[in-house]
Curated annotation (Swiss-Prot):
This is Pericentriolar material 1 protein. Residues 1086-1096, 1189-1198, 1756-1768 have a biased composition (Basic and acidic residues). It comes from Mus musculus. Residues 116-132, 369-385, 870-879, 1149-1169, 1268-1285, 1784-1798, 1818-1828, 1849-1858, 1879-1901, 1925-1934 have a biased composition (Polar residues). It comes from the Eukaryota. Self-associates. Interacts with BBS4, BBS8, CETN3, HAP1, NDE1, NDEL1, MAP1LC3B, GABARAPAL2, and GABARAP. Interacts with CEP131; the interaction increases in response to ultraviolet light (UV) radiation. Associates with microtubule; association to microtubule is reduced in response to cellular stress, such as ultraviolet light (UV) radiation or heat shock, in a process that requires p38 MAP kinase signaling. Interacts with C2CD3. Interacts with CFAP263. Interacts with SSX2IP. Interacts with CCDC13. Interacts with CEP290. Interacts with PARD6A. It holds the Pfam family PCM1_C. Keywords: Acetylation, Cell projection, Cilium biogenesis/degradation, Coiled coil, Cytoplasm, Cytoskeleton, Phosphoprotein, Ubl conjugation.
Length: 2025
């Protein structure tokens, strides 16, 4: 719908389109026009929606096409994705569209609503025919409502409601209300079929015309606003198109109005009659359904009567059997008569149930489907949902009734079963089988019931029923259908029935347990063994029987569902066990016991999943044993039976038929299996009995899963067998009685044998865990693979105690009631033996698991069993994490399978951490299972082992499970996450080894082929690039942006994409090669141990990285994959998920999916690189992968582009070799980064070691294609952002500027990355980046003033500096620093050219064309020439020819200068000196521009700086530039001493800061210093990267609120309402941290739309399934958007500063503040490795937040902070402004570019509200400035405090003094909280620096600029506190008005950059901060205080004092200290 397709209903009626157009000329025309023009309108509206979050925008967009333009997330939720978006659009003209809209609206309200209610003439309403007739009978009118909805965009009321209304129902309601009245009443068109002409009234058309005109006006105003705001030309074009379409629609409406005036409303009655007919049909259908329900009820009553009869017969049998109880218990044959009678009764009962229910099910299904379809149609088409609601309610009621009836039936059955149980306990051998069959049938029915109950959620929140419904979607669907037939019952009745069904299910479960026990007894071996354990476990079971039995009964359903889902496991097991009902009963008993045990130890979900998982395991185990005994026969039977049951399970009749035949065939096999099961169970029981209760929890959980697997399978077989029950049971029970006797002996023997076999298997597993895993995975094939899994399972039982757990489950279940006691009595001896054997097995398992090292081998085996049984085994894993998680897996088998691999992705990091812990616990002992039980009883066993097995199984079942993983790869989001756990890598090492050998050969071939192709493409690309470069950059990019046609860019982009894909594939192949070799190596080596290490490391490590992965759940977990990049690559991750594949995917798609895949994959394979990246950096990278968050959708492309860039880098910079080299380099860098990352590095290093073992270079090549991605690995945050930037850079970006900056940054980053590998290559990349920046510069050169050229030149300088620094090996810090610098330069260009949006767009478009280094180099040279000319001109004007310096200094001085020197003599500095001279010439204006250059433009920049890194770069660059400006100013200004001092101090501080930043942030920064690069310092001055830690804290704080909410709704489906509530919650939580300004509003709108779009993908999915991905998605989006927002805030502030010196001063202050923060944080960062990065991020926030605040407060305040801030950006201006330091006391409106452009206003709306309320737009209003200053002085002081806090660490000079001066300036109330802290901090540092500042101030006051510069620079590096603190308020004002408090908080947290970052991240607006500004002082108070401060500021002495502290801040603004008074004035 993004293309503006039809609404949701239109999608449904897509087939009808031709009918539409064929039905009538009008319809056809309408459709045609609707499709064609509306499509455009939709696009424009869609884009407009994207652009404008405003309701008016929405309205305009809605006017275009509320539904047709689903670009808005809301609309997307409405419109089915299957509906062709543009079909209708293309077919209809605008006038016809208007007509169609009217018709649609009329139809929606009249025809459609009625249709949904009643049968459509088209059959549309008929529930039964609903599906078919919808497509067949959908007539144009059907489309009309949808088209009308689409055309609603024309209709303001309709479109607005729809857009505003998230759900189509709401839209329809609004539509109905707005249109139905007019259209239906007035304009009901008789063309229900769309054949009649719309009979709309002229009044309606007139109203619509008015609406359209209103929309046109709105759209025009929006377009004007966009143009004014320098919005993207695309948006403007979209609005233009929208306006055009609206006008066309207006014309069409006019024409249509004319037509209508000429028409007769004769068709309205037709429509009405049709609607009435439809309603009548619907009513008839409802009556029919009710009759059917009644018939079903009668059937149920009959069944109940039969049940009673059976119960009576059973009672009779009980009488006869009571005497035989002993014999039956002892295995003595019971009279065959009782068995026959029971079998007959039970079979009859079940047959009757089947006869009654299964028929009802199809009818119900049809009815439910038809009703649901009708509802959907009516809902989607009909504006009013009320009618649909009744239908749904009716359906729900019917479902409830059905469920209640089923419950009643179940109750009767349960009563019968209880009777049977009592009898069966007496005659356990005879009755149990009959009752078993019955119970099996009952279970089948009950399962259906319970499943529906679960779906109905009427189960009273029964987790079990819900779970069962989730695990058994098919069964639950059937049951739901049945319930729908019965669903006409009242909800209360349904609830009652559900409760009854639940109780009866429990009873049935108990009975089933009993029967299973009896049948197990009949299978003597199983019974004895099981009963011993069952008595033990029955005690546990009895405790939880009530809850668990339901689960167990549903488990059969779950098993069937799982079987359906995992057609390999339960049903197959069931078929295997079908013959052996006893085995089934054993399994059922086991299920019971497992359920009970689970109930004890595990929540029902866990129990269920464990059951399901372990049922499979158990069945697999039984089959394993069976395989051991009769592996082939059982496998064949189980295969056929499983397949048949899986296939037939939905159709129970067929299943029963097939199962009957299979049961006959499986009887013998079941007997064998019974023997095997008896042996296994005995062995398992022996093993498991030993574990403590908690261990039993784990063991039971696992065993229960296994046994329940067999039990469920057997239950399924029972269901299947019920048809065969009579014959089979008679024969079977006769055989059973014999068998039981034989098997009792055999089981004992077999137990010994099995114990021996298990010991052997354990020994084999220990010896060859890989082989076991491979065998297990091989056995995980549909049947035999599953059986081999079983084969491994016995070993696993020992190893994983899964088999023993299975044994425990049967025993536990057999313990049920009297039967348990009789069995216990009978089997006390057996229990003793079993316990002893269990202890032995336990010891063996413990030893074996310990030997396996964390029981990884066993966990792989268990995983293989579960994965063999089904990938559902993940479910137990998930259930380990959450029982609800279990339903995640249960509801979506595939996703859960893979999620199960990943521990259900909940948060791979978190889950993995759990897994790691579990593994660690496992490593400590097998008894750790009890530890896992609480959260993952089975999950420890199941998740670890299951994951291992999964991965082994999936790899093994490359055809079956593993390839499904490939499918899941495509679904990569949810599945890959799980698969990407280390388990996948482990299994890939182990089991995939075999597959991989073949795949490796193929991959090698493919690799060679792809390498050749890549080389060819690279050559072609080079050729094309050269050609394009020649074309594009011939004359300094002489080609206008127009000339450089987008086609060329497109070609280049496509080439890059092709190359990237080829490179990516090649890298993947190479990675796979290496990984395969690694796997081949490690398989034999220590596949388990490395995995366990990786697990531990990745788990413990991912936990922190996955902090957002889980939140990103699908942001960046594999639903990280689901997130922009993550979830989209689910198929990718699974396919390449295994370490070899995984790294390749990891490198590629993890780039594309960077966070999801990377998060997931880091866990699996390269958690080292990716996990590190996965932490917040990963979300950050995901943000980078998202690139600009606006490019969420582009994220993958950007990632791909990043890959593409990498190929470019490779191709142009060393080709594929580089990736490997880079990989190696990345490893080292990654390790260094890891060391920087503290905890993550260790785990990531461990992973990295492991991954490097497997991937070697791949670990650093997580993004093999994109060295940047590898760089991501290097620097989790910066590298990630850089990688994303690089990827974005290569990706054609919607925002050319973004792309340019991205290119610059990404190329710089790539260069930085490559610099270590290939410095020369790095240079081309940098040149490429620079070239992009410079290409825009040449273009801009004309438009740009020298400032622009200088800015571009700075960009080039930074690029070269980046090149140099990257060449020097400061890769990432230089890279990021350069990227940030470049981006800030680009931002400056943008900010300087904000008035020239089109120029910027063209410029960046051209820059985008600079795809190759050659082009970039040419553009760079051209820009250099231009800049040199401009600089030389400016220098000549200044009397200095600094031109050579500009062109050469950045190249030479950067490399030549020491870090401190580079800071002083940075190219930027030289350039800035030139700038400065030029600026001096231009004077304050140039300074403003320069400052703005230094700062980042806000309007266009938000888009360009979509990448967080890009945005961050702006702040860093601003800081760096500010410092350089300060240096330049200091140097150029008259006060050479001051300049020298500033420069020296700044150099020292800059060097220290840069070194600190390098140390804290990353070695690359140090390398920057090593390769002394001013850019290094400039960007090393912690590139104002967003404080990822702060963002992490903030996002965590948000996610802390969201996660509980999601947990509350884990069982729910992600409805649009739920997603909307989540989105609103997130937005609310996010907004809580931000001030309300236009930019903030825009940001929140953007965030909301992005969240909506990102969350829309989860619509309709079970929250359990996608919750993790959802969280990851949300967290990723939040991270990206918040980072982007902060960067944008900085940009907005900076851009405003560009226009306003105050802003420049603020930016300068922000830069200094960033420097102070940087130095401080660097110092802190040195203490805390992430501190450097945090510094960047904090700077971002501090600048974004603090600078804004400072702008608002300090700019207004006449205090020194203004001067300080001014010093930063306006030090040049300080010469001018310091002269009048107070004179330029800009109000917030002035100081913030946002105020001028409106974005800043949104950001700091609160402040601005105050400021603007005081003097909304007054630029230099002293009162405003003072009031704002007071207000913001608090912020400033806070910010200053933050800076000082930072600076005290970095510079222990100014912090005390600044507070002092600030105290003088700031009113005491403002001071207290933060100033006191500042004073505390500053008093420490200030005493020293106070003198220097005071001295500086003294000189500054005379010449504020020089001194402020000196003081500022002196203070900025060292005393950044003063300057930064003083500037910081301004910087924060400019940088982060919205995030003041966080910055303030940072200030509060003195000398704790991390803490302050955390506070920033956690609290954008801290209570301390906000109250100081907002809460503590009202505007009036603030004004008063500001006035007071102004009065204080009036004092020159105070100003001097304050300027001593704050002089740097306001020095630019305050040219003269005396002006301080002027400011206050």
């Amino acid at each position: 719908m993004a293309t503006g397709g039809g609404p949701f209903e239109e999608v449904m009626h897509d087939q009808d389109l031709p009918n539409w157009s064929n039905d009538s000329v009008d319809d056809r025309l309408n459709n045609m026009e609707w499709g064609g023009q509306q499509k455009k309108a939709n696009r424009s509206s869609e884009k407009n929606k994207k652009k404008f979050g405003v309701a008016s925008d929405k309205r305009v967009t809605n006017a275009i096409s509320p539904e047709s333009s689903p670009g808005v997330g809301r609309r997307r939720t409405k419109i089915p994705h299957t509906f062709p978006h543009s079909r209708y659009m293309t077919q209809m003209s605008v006038p016809e569209q208007a007509e169609l809209e009217k018709l649609k609206q009329r139809i929606n309200f009249s025809d459609l609503d009625q249709r949904s209610i009643g049968s459509d003439s088209q059959g549309r309403a008929t529930a039964a025919n609903n599906k078919r007739q919808l497509s067949e009978n959908r007539k144009p009118f059907n489309f009309l409502p949808m088209q009308i909805n689409t055309n609603k965009s024309k209709d303001a009321t309709a479109s607005l409601p729809k857009r505003e209304m998230t759900t189509s129902a709401q839209c329809k309601e609004l539509f109905a209300s707005a249109l139905s009245n007019d259209l239906l009443q007035n304009c009901q068109v008789s063309e229900e079929d769309g054949r009649g002409e719309p009979a709309m009234e002229s009044s309606q058309i007139v109203s619509r015309l008015v609406q359209i005109r209103d929309y046109i006006t709105k759209a025009s105003s929006m377009r004007e606003d966009l143009v004014e705001k320098n919005e993207r030309s695309a948006n403007v074009e979209r609005l233009t198109h929208l306006i055009e379409h609206l006008k066309e629609q207006e014309k069409s409406y006019m024409k249509f109005l004319q037509k209508i005036l000429a028409r007769d409303p004769q068709q309205e009655p037709m429509e009405e009659t049709e609607n009435l007919k439809k309603q009548h049909d619907l009513l008839k259908r409802m009556l029919q359904q009710q009759e059917q329900l009644r018939a079903l009820q009668g059937r149920q009553a009959a069944l109940l009567a039969l049940q009673h009869k059976a119960e009576q017969a059973i009672a009779v049998m009980d009488d006869s059997v009571v005497t035989e109880t002993t014999g039956s218990l002892s295995g003595v044959s019971i009279t065959s008569e009782l068995n026959e009678e029971l079998n007959d009764l039970i079979q009859r009962f079940h047959n009757q149930l089947r006869d009654s229910q299964p028929p009802a099910v199809p009818d119900n299904r049809r009815q439910a489907e038809s009703l649901s379809l009708t509802r959907e149609i009516s809902q989607s088409r009909n504006p009013s949902v009320s009618e649909h609601l009744p239908d749904e309610k009716v359906q729900l009621f019917s479902k409830m009734r059905v469920l209640q009836e089923k419950k009643q039936k179940m109750d009767k059955l349960l009563g019968e079963l209880h009777n049977l149980r009592d009898q069966h306990l007496n005659n356990s051998s005879f009755v149990p089988s009959t009752s078993l069959q019955r119970s099996g049938d009952k279970r089948s029915s009950t399962v259906a019931l319970s499943a529906p109950v679960g779906f109905a959620s009427a189960v009273n929140g029964e987790a079990n029923s819900l779970i069962s419904s989730v695990p058994c979607p098919a069964t639950s669907l059937v049951s739901q259908n049945e319930s729908e037939n019965e669903g006409h019952l009242n909800p209360a009745e349904k609830l009652q029935k559900l409760n009854e069904v639940q109780k009866r299910l429990n009873e049935l479960r108990e009975l089933v347990h009993y029967y299973e026990q009896t049948s197990d007894m009949m299978t003597d071996a199983v019974n004895e063994n099981t009963k011993d354990e069952e008595t033990e476990e029955s005690e546990y079971d009895s405790e939880h029987e009530n809850s668990e039995p339901v689960t167990n009964i549903r488990n059969p359903q779950v098993a069937s569902t799982w079987n359906e889902v995992n057609t390999n496991s339960n049903t197959q097991c069931g078929s295997n066990n079908r013959d052996g009902r006893p085995v089934n009963s054993n399994c059922e008993i086991n299920n019971r016991s497992a359920a009970n045990i689970r109930a004890l130890n595990m929540p029902p979900l866990d129990c269920r999943y464990n059951r399901e998982g372990e049922q499979r395991l158990h069945v697999a185990h039984g089959e394993d044993e069976e395989e051991e005994v009769e592996e082939e026969g059982v496998s064949g039977a189980s295969l056929s039976s499983r397949r048949s049951s899986l296939v037939d399970e939905a159709p129970e009749d067929e299943e029963f038929e097939q199962k009957i035949s299979r049961l006959m065939a499986a009887k013998e096999k079941l007997k064998q299996l019974q023997d095997l099961v008896a042996m296994v169970q005995d062995d398992d029981a022996t093993q498991v009995v030993v574990p403590a209760a908690s261990n039993l929890d784990d063991f039971y959980a696992a065993e229960e899963d296994i046994k329940q697997n067999s039990n469920n399978a057997r239950e399924n077989s029972n269901k299947i067998d019920t048809g065969v029950n009579e014959k089979t049971r008679e024969k079977f029970y006769e055989a059973k009685l014999q068998q039981q006797q034989r098997e009792l002996k055999q089981l004992q023997e077999e137990r010994k044998k099995l114990i021996e076999i298990q010991e052997k298997i354990q020994a084999v597993q220990k010896a060859c865990p890989d082989l076991q895993l491979s065998a297990t995975s091989i056995s995980s094939g549909p049947t035999k693979k599953y059986l081999p899994a079983i084969t491994s399972t016995p070993t696993v039982n020992e190893n994983d105690s899964s088999t023993s757990k299975c044994v425990i489950d049967p025993e536990d279940s057999s313990v049920v009631d009297n039967e348990l006691w009789s069995d216990m009595r009978r089997h006390e001896m057996l229990r003793e033996e079993l316990r002893q054997r269990r202890k032995q097995l336990e010891a063996l398992m413990a030893e074996h698991q310990r030997r396996q090292g964390l029981a990884e081998t066993s966990s792989p085996v268990a995983i293989s069993l579960r994965s063999d049984g089904s990938e559902n085994l993940c479910t137990p894993q998930q259930s380990r994490t959450e029982k609800t998680m279990a339903t995640w897996g249960g509801s979506t088998q595939c996703a859960l399978d893979e999620e199960g691999d990943e521990d259900g992705y909940l948060s791979e990091g978190i889950v993995r951490t759990d897994e790691e812990e579990e593994e660690e616990q496992d490593a400590s002992s097998n008894d750790n299972f009890p530890i896992y039980p609480p959260s993952m009883n089975q999950n420890s066993y199941n998740v670890k082992e299951t994951k291992t097995r999964w991965k082994s199984n999936r790899p093994v079942s490359a055809d079956g499970n593993y390839r499904p993983l490939a499918k899941t790869r495509q679904q990569n989001i949810s599945m890959q996450r799980q698969e990407n756990l280390r388990w996948v890598s482990e299994l890939s090492y182990i089991e995939e080894k075999e597959q991989w050998q073949e795949q490796i050969n193929q991959l090698k071939k493919q690799l060679d082929f792809s390498v050749n192709i890549c080389q060819t493409l690279m050559q072609d690309q080079q050729t094309l690039s050269c050609l394009l470069q020649t074309l594009l950059t011939g004359p300094y990019s002489v080609l206008p942006s127009n000339v450089a046609s987008p086609q060329v860019h497109l070609i280049m982009h496509q080439l890059n994409q092709c190359y990237t894909q080829l490179t990516w594939q090649q890298n993947n192949v190479q990675r796979l090669k290496q990984m395969l070799t690694e796997l081949m190596r490690q398989q034999n080596q220590h596949p388990e141990k490395p995995r366990s290490k990786e697990r531990g490391s990745s788990a413990s490590h991912p936990s922190s990285p996955n902090l957002f992965c889980p939140f990103s759940f699908p942001t960046q977990p594999v639903n990280l994959f689901n997130l922009p990049g993550f979830t989209n690559f689910p198929s990718f991750a699974p396919g390449m998920n295994f370490s070899p594949l995984f790294p390749s995917n990891f490198g590629d798609f993890s780039q594309n999916v960077s966070t999801p895949t990377e998060q997931q994959q880091p866990l699996a394979q390269n958690p080292s690189g990716k996990t590190e990246y996965m932490a917040f950096p990963k979300p950050f990278e995901s943000s980078s992968s998202l690139g600009a968050e606006k490019q969420r959708n582009q994220k993958q492309p950007e990632e791909e582009a990043e890959n593409t860039k990498t190929p470019w880098l490779y191709d142009q910079e060393g080709g594929v070799e580089k990736p490997f080299f880079k990989t190696g380099f990345t490893e080292s860098v990654e390790k260094a980064t890891n060391s920087n990352r503290k905890n993550q590095p260790d785990t990531s290093r461990r992973r990295r070691q492991f991954d490097e073992e497997s991937l070697e270079s791949f670990s650093s090549m997580p993004d093999p294609i994109d060295p940047t991605t590898v760089t991501k690995t290097f620097k989790t945050r910066k590298a990630s952002a850089q990688a994303s930037l690089a990827s974005k850079d290569k990706t054609p970006k919607s925002k050319s500027k973004k792309r340019n900056s991205t290119q610059l940054k990404s190329r710089v980053k790539n260069i930085g990355y490559e610099s270590a590998s290939v410095s020369s290559t790095c240079e081309p990349c940098k040149n490429r980046n620079r070239h992009s920046a410079q290409t825009e510069e040449p273009v801009q050169a004309k438009l740009f003033s020298r400032k622009n050229h200088e800015q571009l030149e700075k960009i080039i300088k930074y690029s070269r500096s980046a090149e140099i620094s990257s060449e020097t090996g400061s890769d990432f810090s230089m890279f990021e620093a350069l990227r940030d610098t470049i981006y800030s330069e680009v931002a400056t260009l943008i900010s300087q050219n904000e008035s020239r949006p089109h120029f910027l767009i063209e410029l960046f478009h051209e820059l985008q064309l600079l795809n190759t280094d050659y082009l970039r180099q040419r553009a760079l040279y051209a820009l250099q020439d231009i800049v040199s000319r401009h600089i030389s001109e400016s220098d000549e004007r200044e009397g200095e020819n600094v031109k050579p310096v500009n062109s050469g200094t950045w190249v030479a001085s950067n490399s030549e200068l020491t870090p401190s020197e580079s800071l002083v003599t940075t190219d930027d500095e030289t350039f800035e000196k030139n700038f400065e001279r030029e600026t001096h010439k231009v004077s304050e204006q140039n300074d403003a521009d320069n400052v703005s250059v230094m700062s980042v433009s806000s309007n266009f920049e938000p888009f360009a700086t979509d990448d967080l890194g890009n945005t961050v770069i702006h702040l860093d660059q601003a800081l760096a530039r500010m410092r350089e400006y300060e240096r330049m100013k200091t140097e150029t200004e008259s006060h050479s001493n001051m300049r020298c001092t500033c420069r020296v101090i700044e150099d020292e501080d800059g060097a220290a800061a840069a070194a600190t930043v390098s140390n804290s942030e990353e070695t690359p920064i140090i390398e920057n210093h090593n390769s002394p690069q001013p850019i290094s310092d400039v960007s090393a001055v912690p590139c104002p990267r967003i404080d990822t830690q702060q963002l992490d804290r903030q996002i965590k704080a948000i996610m802390k609120e969201v996660i509980p909410f999601l947990k509350e709704h884990m069982d729910e489906v992600c409805s649009s309402q739920l997603l909307t509530s989540v989105r609103r919650m997130v937005l609310t939580l996010t907004q809580q941290n931000d001030e309300s300004k236009e930019f903030v509003k825009f940001f929140h709108k953007q965030l909301g739309s992005i969240l909506q779009d990102s969350l829309a993908k989860f619509a309709g999915r079970k929250l359990k399934d996608c919750g993790e991905d959802l969280l990851v998605e949300i967290s990723e989006v939040l991270f990206n958007e918040l980072a982007f927002f902060k960067l944008m805030q900085d940009l907005d502030n900076n851009s405003i500063a560009v226009k306003q010196r105050c802003k420049r001063k603020i930016e300068a202050a922000g830069v200094r503040q960033s420097y102070a923060k940087e130095a401080k944080r660097i110092l802190e960062g040195d203490h805390g490795s992430p501190a450097g990065e945090i510094d960047d991020e904090d700077k971002d926030k501090d600048e974004t937040e603090t600078v804004k605040q400072t702008q608002t407060s300090e700019v207004y305040d006449a205090k020194g902070p203004k001067n300080v801030r001014s010093d930063v950006s306006d030090q040049e201006e300080d010469e001018e402004s310091e002269r009048c330091p107070v004179s330029i006391n800009l109000s917030k409106a002035e100081s913030q570019a946002l105020t001028n452009y409106g974005s800043g206003e949104d950001e700091n709306e609160d402040e601005e509200m105050e400021d603007f309320e005081e003097s909304p737009v007054d630029i230099q209003t002293s009162l405003q400035a003072n009031t704002e200053t007071t207000e913001e002085n608090e912020h400033d002081s806070q910010i200053l405090q933050h800076d000082l806090e930072k600076t005290p660490e970095s510079t222990n000079v100014p912090s005390d003094q600044e507070p002092t001066s600030k105290n003088d300036q700031d009113s005491s109330p403002v001071k207290p909280c933060y100033l006191n802290i500042l004073e505390n901090e500053q008093q420490l540092n200030s005493a020293t620096h106070k003198d220097s500042l005071t001295t500086t101030d003294s000189s500054k006051q005379p010449e504020p600029l020089p001194l402020p510069l000196a003081a500022s620079e002196t203070l900025v590096p060292r005393v950044k506190e003063v300057k930064s603190a003083q500037e910081t308020p301004e910087s924060s004002l400019a940088g982060s008005p919205d995030t003041e408090s966080p910055v303030l908080v940072n200030d509060y947290e003195a000398e704790s950059g991390n803490i302050s970052q955390k506070s920033d991240e956690e609290d954008f607006v801290k209570v301390e901060d906000l109250p100081l500004k907002l809460t503590v002082y009202s505007e009036e108070e603030l004004r008063k205080k500001m006035i007071e401060e102004e009065q204080k500021n009036h004092l020159s002495g105070e100003i001097c004092e304050m300027q001593t502290e704050e002089l740097a801040g306001n020095s630019q603004i305050l040219k003269e200290p005396e002006t301080v008074g002027a400011q206050s004035i």
